[in-house]
Swiss-Prot record:
GO biological process: ribosome disassembly
Protein name: Elongation factor G
Pfam families the record matches: EFG_C (PF00679), EFG_III (PF14492), EFG_IV (PF03764), GTP_EFTU (PF00009), GTP_EFTU_D2 (PF03144)
CDD domains: EF-G, EFG_III, EFG_mtEFG1_IV, EFG_mtEFG_C, EFG_mtEFG_II
Organism of derivation: Cronobacter sakazakii (strain ATCC BAA-894) (Enterobacter sakazakii)
PROSITE patterns associated with the record: G_TR_1 (PS00301), G_TR_2 (PS51722)
Keywords, comma-separated and alphabetical: Cytoplasm, Elongation factor, GTP-binding, Nucleotide-binding, Protein biosynthesis
Gene Ontology CC terms: cytoplasm
Ranges of residues in domain tr-type G: 8-290
A molecular function GO annotation: guanosine tetraphosphate binding
Amino acid sequence: MARTTPIARYRNIGISAHIDAGKTTTTERILFYTGVNHKIGEVHDGAATMDWMEQEQERGITITSAATTAFWSGMAKQYEPHRINIIDTPGHVDFTIEVERSMRVLDGAVMVYCAVGGVQPQSETVWRQANKYKVPRIAFVNKMDRMGANFLKVVGQIKTRLGANPVPLQLAIGAEEGFTGVVDLVKMKAINWNDADQGVTFEYEDIPADMQDLADEWHQNLIESAAEASEELMEKYLGGEELTEEEIKKALRQRVLNNEIILVTCGSAFKNKGVQAMLDAVIDYLPSPVDVPAINGILDDGKDTPAERHASDEEPFSALAFKIATDPFVGNLTFFRVYSGVVNSGDTILNSVKSARERFGRIVQMHANKREEIKEVRAGDIAAAIGLKDVTTGDTLCNPDHPIILERMEFPEPVISIAVEPKTKADQEKMGLALGRLAKEDPSFRVWTDEESNQTIIAGMGELHLDIIVDRMKREFNVEANVGKPQVAYREAIRSKVTDIEGKHAKQSGGRGQYGHVVIDMYPLEPGSNPKGYEFINDIKGGVIPGEYIPAVDKGIQEQLKSGPLAGYPVVDIGIRLHFGSYHDVDSSELAFKLAASIAFKEGFKKAKPVLLEPIMKVEVETPEENTGDVIGDLSRRRGMLRGQESEVTGVKIHAEVPLSEMFGYATQLRSLTKGRASYTMEFLKYDDAPNNVAQAVIEARGK
């Protein structure tokens, strides 16, 4: 089968935003205008196409990033058909992992902001993730029809809060109820969409006389930004020559692809205005798979040779699995992005991360929760495979004759855990199966059995995250569970270096004995300096410990890290240097050295000024002005550190850092303090030393 759409006409984009910026409605309109959807789905009545899990429809928030394929030939049918693969990403902080996953496989992104609320805390998180993966982006300022809408204020916030370089591509004509259309600053024309056909058709008109001066000023700003793309254009501009529309677009595109500017569009998805022009901007300014750098990887050749794969059908097949979803009808769906080559249904592929071969059964292209079966996928495609057995998020799928491991994704550690137990004996077995499936889908969700209490513990990124997991167990797997009180994921660390700590395990009891002897130094690592939070240096000279026992020493210490000496929490940011020891020709064994290492570790840890670390959350509260004092007082009582406040149209925004352990039940308290008028967001910021009294209470409660 030949390629139907040239790869240069592909756009793999994410639509990303703060909760309530109207992202799902925006995606719905995209699907409507691209001719996929014939009746517009509204989020308000739970009918939106992209929100396909029941919990999403009930809660009106997007949880799973569904991937959808659509085609667009331009608002005025001015292009050849372009294939747009859209990944819808959630806007709630507890689902940041979903955003991280989708950013990894996107080529470009549309950031949706609310014209009233502007740049919110979650917008900043998403922005950092887009920066990390160097994703070129444009912005769409939505809800221009709402009370308090102010386009240029949001443009200012993109500059000040995100440190970006926003360049408006349009201006809003009117605002709130008077919002009627936009000024196209490239063409210098007003665009008015036709309400009668839900904005499918439009007219170019003259710019309203009272906006001409403002439009001229921002047109000039746009031209200057374009001219900065090259010396040649700058000379032309400074020489007083007009830049052509084609030159302007080409120059702006180049600057967006280089992540130098963010083009800003606006509209009201709900009122069917602006989304159409934003789609044109996706085609004009966001990259195709051939415009972004080749993906890096390492060859599976035992030497970890660096390699790259270009977006071409001619190169060997390589793809990244970025999401696993359980579908009630077909079982496991593995969403993957093809970076190079071609694969057909029925082909055998290699999961190079697990060194396992899999057979591609059926391949489907998703449109929200409808699916279309296809025979092959090519470089640049995003699709889902049915029936892959052992694939986890972040695995590489590739041609078995040309194995490569693409860059792995990094997933955050959970910060909150709860105990769950099945309500009945019948639920017991089903619960294990359900939790296993859900953990496979979501790498930021963990499940384990607590060795002391024998309880099943689930851990995730926040209370809402775990609520939804428990909810899904009930709905999708019919498992009823009792849920315990949330527990904080503390950590343990050391604050000083200790040297020459000895650990000796020697047993002589008739026949062969056991003998292992190690001497180690232990030192703190700078938080975040080592992704594993642990380093092991083998500094043994002259074979005082034979090489075959060194891994056992490392393993013995790593086992101790899982449950620290203070209160049984994981130990982080610690370095070990093994530099001396001794062995016995007959009595030494791996087990003996493992035990010697664990003895040395416990001994050293006690002397190295151990501390308990607690997760600190970044909290932002928006409250009416008259409640500011109460809200700040309450945050202080929760050991919160105030980091500033600012006035907003709707009241006051308070920034604080608060320990997670003090934030349980905060939503209820905030509601009663402000009669339900305040809202807050919270996301993990860092681990910090817990004060003595808090640490003591935690240690005593753990019975250590």
